Amino acid sequence: MLFSGTIEQNLRWGNEDATPKQIEQACQVADAFNFISELPAGLKTELGQGGVNLSGGQKQRLCIARALLKNPKILILDDSMSAVDTATDSRIRSALRNCLPQTTKIVIAQRIASVQEADFIVVLDEGKITGIGTHSQLLQDNKVYKEIYDSQIRKN
């Protein structure tokens, strides 16, 4: 969720004392730095309530950057990259892995690509756990996971 005010003000909800360098680093990890830099006013760009002047993917990336400014021990991403393309999703996941190695990340996603490198994956079907394991284990042992994987691979 974004609020009226500037991009910087929205990010500072995560840490009002964040330095410009910390804000830049969080934006880099969230793959938001480039699109912010391309805006005429950059971080000083005014957002309408809910960030109406940004795309869904841009809003999600700003929310991720704001969460990163809290320097969390646990980061929960609940379908937080659903509005970004797969290449952006991949860049963000890679940056999170490399820049926050000590942070526990809980990723809730519908895209297999978003979770396949996780230490372990919990598969839910109609609210019930049907499997827990690594990507390769679940492909081999879990019918629901395999069906989701096959349907997404065929789409691509």
Residue ranges and their predicted role:
Residues 89-101:
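Helical segment within the ABC ATPase nucleotide-binding domain
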Residues 69-73, 102:
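A short, proline-enriched helix->beta-strand linker immediately N-terminal to the Walker B motif
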Residues 75-79:
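Catalytic Walker B motif of ABC-type/P-loop ATPase nucleotide-binding domains
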Residues 8-49, 102:
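ABC ATPase nucleotide-binding domain helical subdomain, centered on the C-loop/LSGGQ "ABC signature"
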Residues 98-109, 115:
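Conserved catalytic loops of ABC-family nucleotide-binding domains
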Residues 64-65, 109:
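Short alpha-helix in the ABC ATPase nucleotide-binding domain helical subdomain
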Residues 33-62, 80, 84-87, 154-156:
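ABC-fold ATPase nucleotide-binding domain signature/coupling loops
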Residues 37-38, 87, 94, 116-156:
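C-terminal portion of ABC ATPase nucleotide-binding domains
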